[in-house]
C-alpha cells in the first residue's frame, strides 16, 4: 500500500516516538499537571536552572511525537546563558483530544496549557518548579518576563498559547517578550496556526523563525509558509538551505530522528543557537542588536521585504513576511 503526504509524516512521527534520549542528571526532572477534559494529565516536565538569577523564563516545547528529552541539549544551552527553562513533554495521541498538535480539536487542551502562564503564584507552573527544586526553595519564584520557543508542531502550540494570553490574560500577556519558532509545522487539521498568527500580527510581539528547507518532516514547510503569509513584517526569520528538521534538537536527537529527518548539521546547530541566543537577549532587553538582523537591505517602497544578510549567520536565507 502506498502512503503519501500526511500519512507518511504520521508514520514517521509515530516511529520517532518509540525512542528518545534519557534525561540526564544535571536537569531538574519533575511533572506538570494540566487539565484534560474531566481528568488531569500529569506530564513529565524538566526544568533547567541557571547558576545565577534568571534573566527570564523560557517555555521550550518539543515537536510532534517527540519528548522533552529531545530538547535537553538546547535547554541546557539556554540555561547556561542565564535563562530558567521549562520543558514539558506533551501527548501526541489522546482520546480526549489533549494533544500537542490538532488531530480534531485540541483547543480546549491548549487553553488549559495557556492557563499555566496566567501568572497565578499558586498555580500548576509554580508548583511544578517548587517540586522540582526540592530543598532549593529560595529560587522558586518564576520570572515575570518570558519567551516561548517551539520546535515543529510545538511551534503551533506556542503560537496558539501566545494568542490565548493576548485574548484572555492581559497581565500575563504583558510579560510575554516574544516567540521563536524552530522549523514550525502546522497541524494536518484545523487552522490553529493561521488564527493565532492573525491575532498576533498586529500586536508587535516579536515572532521569528529558524527554518529548514521544505521536507516531509516539516510538512513541506507548512509552518514557515503560514508565517510568511500572515505576518505583515519585513523580516520574520531565516532559512538554512542545508538545514534538517533535527537541527533544533542537536545532540539530543536520536538514531531514528537522524534516519527519518536527517542528522543535525553541526554548523547549522551552532548557527541556530547563536541566532536564537541573540534574539532572546534582544527580546528580554527590548533592544535590536544589528548582528542578528538583516543588513545591506535594498528595501524600497515598491519592494518592502527584508533582504541582505545577517552578520551572525551570513549563509542563512533571509525570510520576509507579506
What kind of region is each of these model predictions?
Residues 54-63:
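Short beta-strand element of the alpha/beta-hydrolase
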Residues 218-322:
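C-terminal catalytic-base region of ester-bond hydrolases, centering on the histidine
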Residues 128-195, 200-202:
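Primarily recognizes the serine-hydrolase "nucleophile elbow" in alpha/beta-hydrolase
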Residues 69-88:
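Short amphipathic alpha-helix adjacent to the substrate-entry channel of hydrolases
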Residues 25-53:
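N-terminal cap/lid segment of alpha/beta-hydrolase-fold proteins
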